[in-house]
Amino acid sequence: MKMETFLVCLFHNADGLHQQIQEILYLLRMHIYETNLYLKQELSRLIYPNRQLSFVLLMPLSLLRNWDDIEYLTDVVDDKQTLHYAANLLTNYVLHLSMFQKLTKPYFLLAVKRVSEKLNKKQRHSFYEVLVTSETLNNYENLSKNILNTLMFAVRYVFKPTPNYSEILAELEKKNKIHHIIFNMVITDFAQIREQQMDKHLCETNNELRQECKETIFDLKVVGNV
């Protein structure tokens, strides 16, 4: 998946942002050839007053340039709403990069940890609280695999200290049974995931849901092995 395609998909429901997105994509392509200072000036012009866009810029900018500007873009945003938005958006982005471009874990972990640390330090909200909020799940209700992959990624690689799994599971169970089932499996070792376990958990569900579960577990294994 191309970066341009993914960014546009993220904002398919955002009115009035199309032109800004096109400008951003143009600048990102220029960034390969231009200096960081020039790009900073141009990006600053675009991200205000809508500072949520700063994190759309943070992701590809950091990936293109060895993370030089990551603190600049994270430190300009302090409000809780934008940080929550950024944490979810950023995690989904790096997950897609890991699957489609085969990036190594240390390379994309830094950005997620940076946002997570900022959340914990300034807002006193842990990363998992962001991921299990109703707003986050509702925003991605039609992208169930993205949600599940995000949760798996956060648990396997980001959480420090270890989160309270029971709280996460309880929150997920309220919202969507399939999310709860998959997540419960994910926090165990992948070797323990067997078809008979799925049958036990999904004995009251239909075949279509069972197939979705199998496909999702396959996706999770792929991401987990990046």
UniProtKB/Swiss-Prot annotation:
Induction: Expressed in the intermediate phase of the viral replicative cycle (immediately after DNA replication). Plays a role in the inhibition of host NF-kappa-B and IRF3 signaling pathways. Mechanistically, promotes the degradation of host IKBKG through enhancing its ubiquitination leading to inhibition of both pathways. The lineage of its organism: Viruses, Varidnaviria, Bamfordvirae, Nucleocytoviricota, Pokkesviricetes. Keywords: Glycoprotein, Host-virus interaction, Inhibition of host NF-kappa-B by virus, Signal. This is Late protein I226R. Belongs to the asfivirus I226R family. Residues 1-16 form the signal peptide. Glycans are attached at N142, N164. GO terms for biological process: symbiont-mediated suppression of host NF-kappaB cascade. It comes from African swine fever virus (isolate Tick/South Africa/Pretoriuskop Pr4/1996).
